[in-house]
């Protein structure tokens, strides 16, 4: 039997479960209100003021820094823009915005980093595959970077005040629409001079293309030697002269310090036989002794001295033409119009007695080029080469009464003995350049002093052998350098003599000056002693030295 009314009571477990459910609902609501209030009031006015002080303390400068930020032109949605920018601001404060420790700016950055860590719970994370979407590289000043950071915090505060859950929006679709291509707004560097590739053909370079100063070697030097002269402040003419064989080194354009580059004119040399097949050009050192008879027969009788009046050498030749003698058998003298860059090829035309004569032994044989004359089976061009001292091509017109050898006759080839006695011959006509006509006329006064003196009134003998000039294989550039005489010293020897002579002169002057100063001091000391010598005698002795010697006791 049960107690009365016991059947209408509820078990205690039922009331306990409902009570726990009510408590859970109240707790969840309070937690939600706390989270919303926490995100809405996360960013205070003090954080924005510290950012403004950070901006005001920066120095205005034109120096730009590189950083990655959101491209607002691609991402139009403001919520997605701030959601992407918030993650990038964290990286910027950690990597770019750095200050010295324990300074007000460094403390402000630490506070902002702590704020961004607390705000991270208010943002939902999107897919990682869109991390670089809508992001590009910016090149701006530090002030502009700080302005962007301040705007991000300010806009985030305004949106969180309106809706604390606004950044839970899914922005994957907006990020997918953006192109992840990184657009660079400015180039990394401004290259002033494009690098020129060294080429053996200067004409292939454009006239308007500037040369890089470090890539253009000095003319006449090898490529390894030109690299050693890059850091030197000497002009091309002041560099040590290096002789280079034209067959072993390619022709390279000279060093240019200007913006424009003019390709040098390459002299045209026709080297062929009657059949038209080109023959290999013999080297300078390899000279066949069997050619002595051929050269002697070709040059000994057909080339006669020029008239002694000197009228033929004074014929003015325009600068735009070059004299090109035709085949000896042709019997004609041709004047060909040349390009503006060509120069005068010869100082005087062929004499009239040389026309119509043809060598008998060299009709079908191509001869090697010796000196300034190279007879061949075909027509050939004559281009003189600049030497260290003026040769017969650049001499002044002789005085009346003194005959002169023709300018086109090879020097020292009148007899076979002189042919073997002169081993050093001209290397190549195409390896050097020719002085302009105006420069030749302007240097006549200096040529007279440098050229070897000739006997006054003595006629030049036709068979007399003149010493061959020492040719310089290194062509001079357009800087107008002085030519050296035959007996002059090399630049290294002159420099060493100068360095030895100046100290020796200074030492001699110092020695002479010291000797004079010593003599002057000695005289100045002797004069007071002579003046004080009468006073040094004792006052009580009226006798002189002679009297003392007389009165000595015996």
UniProtKB/Swiss-Prot annotation:
GO terms for molecular function: cytokine activity; growth factor activity; identical protein binding; macrophage colony-stimulating factor receptor binding; protein homodimerization activity. Residues 224-488, 526-554 are annotated as: Disordered. Its main location: membrane. This is Macrophage colony-stimulating factor 1. Residues 1-32 form the signal peptide. It is found in: Cell membrane. Residues 33-496 are lumenal. Residues 404-433 have a biased composition (Polar residues). Residues 344-354 have a biased composition (Low complexity). Pfam families: CSF-1. Keywords: Cell membrane, Cytokine, Disulfide bond, Glycoprotein, Growth factor, Immunity, Inflammatory response, Innate immunity, Membrane, Phosphoprotein, Proteoglycan, Secreted, Signal, Transmembrane, Transmembrane helix. Residues 518-554 are cytoplasmic. Residues 440-453, 545-554 have a biased composition (Basic and acidic residues). Residues 406-426 are annotated as: O-glycosylated at one site. The chain crosses the membrane at residues 497-517. Disulfide bonds join 39-122, 80-171, 134-178. One of its GO terms (cellular component) is plasma membrane.
């Amino acid at each position: 039997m049960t107690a009365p009314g016991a059947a209408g009571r509820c078990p205690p477990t039922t009331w306990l479960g409902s009570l726990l459910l009510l408590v859970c609902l109240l707790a969840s609501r309070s937690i939600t209100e706390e989270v919303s209030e926490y995100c809405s009031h996360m960013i205070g006015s003090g954080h924005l003021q510290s950012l403004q002080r950070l901006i005001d303390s920066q120095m205005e400068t034109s120096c730009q820094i590189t950083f990655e930020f959101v491209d607002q032109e691609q991402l139009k949605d403001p919520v997605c823009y701030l959601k992407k920018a918030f993650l990038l601001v964290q990286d910027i404060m950690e990597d770019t915005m750095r200050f010295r420790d324990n300074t007000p700016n460094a403390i402000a950055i630490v506070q902002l980093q702590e704020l961004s860590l607390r705000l991270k719970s208010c943002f939902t994370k999107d897919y990682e595959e869109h991390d670089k979407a809508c992001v590009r590289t910016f090149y701006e000043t530090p002030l502009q970077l700080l302005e962007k950071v301040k705007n991000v915090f300010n806009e985030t505060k305004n949106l969180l005040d309106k809706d604390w859950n606004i950044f839970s929006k899914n922005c994957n679709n907006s990020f997918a629409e953006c192109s992840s291509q990184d657009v660079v707004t400015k180039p990394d560097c401004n290259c002033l001079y494009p690098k020129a590739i060294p080429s053996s053909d200067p004409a292939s370079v454009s006239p308007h293309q500037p040369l890089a100063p470090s890539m253009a070697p000095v003319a006449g030097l090898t490529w390894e030697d030109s690299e050693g002269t890059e850091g030197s402040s000497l002009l091309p003419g002041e560099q040590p002269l290096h002789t280079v064989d034209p067959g072993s080194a390619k022709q390279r354009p000279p060093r240019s310090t200007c913006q424009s580059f003019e390709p040098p004119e390459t002299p045209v040399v026709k080297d062929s036989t009657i059949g038209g097949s080109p023959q290999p050009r013999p080297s300078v050192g390899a000279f066949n002794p069997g050619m002595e008879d051929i050269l002697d027969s070709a040059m000994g009788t057909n080339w006669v001295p020029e008239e002694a009046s000197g009228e033929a050498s004074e014929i003015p030749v325009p600068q735009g033409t070059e004299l090109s003698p035709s085949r000896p058998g042709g019997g004609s003298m041709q004047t060909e119009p040349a390009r503006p860059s060509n120069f005068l090829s010869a100082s005087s035309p062929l004499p009239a007695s040389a026309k119509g004569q043809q060598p008998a032994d060299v009709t079908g044989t191509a001869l090697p080029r010796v000196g300034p004359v190279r007879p061949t089976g075909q027509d050939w061009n004559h281009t003189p080469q600049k030497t260290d001292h003026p040769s017969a091509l650049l001499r002044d017109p002789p005085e009346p009464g003194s005959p002169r050898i023709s300018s086109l006759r090879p020097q020292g080839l009148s007899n076979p003995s002189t042919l073997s006695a002169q081993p050093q011959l001209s290397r190549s006509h195409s390896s050097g350049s020719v002085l302009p006509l105006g420069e030749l006329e302007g240097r006549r006064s200096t040529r007279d002093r440098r050229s070897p003196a000739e006997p006054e009134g003595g006629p030049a003998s036709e068979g007399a052998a003149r010493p061959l000039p020492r040719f310089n294989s290194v062509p001079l550039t357009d800087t107008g350098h002085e030519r050296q005489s035959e007996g002059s010293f090399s630049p290294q020897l002159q420099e060493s003599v100068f360095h030895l002579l100046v100290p020796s002169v200074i030492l001699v002057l110092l020695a002479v000056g010291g000797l004079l100063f010593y003599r002057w001091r000695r005289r100045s000391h002797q004069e007071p002693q002579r003046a004080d010598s009468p006073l040094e005698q004792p006052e009580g002795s009226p006798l002189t030295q002679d009297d003392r010697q007389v009165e000595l006791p015996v």
